[in-house]
Amino acid sequence: MIKYLKSKGIYHLNLYGDGFSGKGKPDLLVCINGRFVAFELKVGSNDMQDDQIIHKLRIERSGGLHYSPYTVEEFISIVEDLLNEKA
């Protein structure tokens, strides 16, 4: 996913597993067409935890976007849709 974002020239911060970002923070913070977008990357049937839901609500309340894709294909589809939106 990081390689894909780099190939598109998209600014991003990878917080996954850094140990310093705090509990429940999204895995990726991205700027697409000037929009703040957060991604909580999920695997299998792994649902969002309560602390992750709190951060999701805070981001959305602030006007940002939050997504929880379960596959690389779903992630790419979301990013492509956002890239194609009129700014």
Task: Give names to the regions the model predicted.
Residues 1-87:
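Catalytic phosphate/metal-binding cores of nucleic-acid and nucleotide-processing enzymes, i.e., regions
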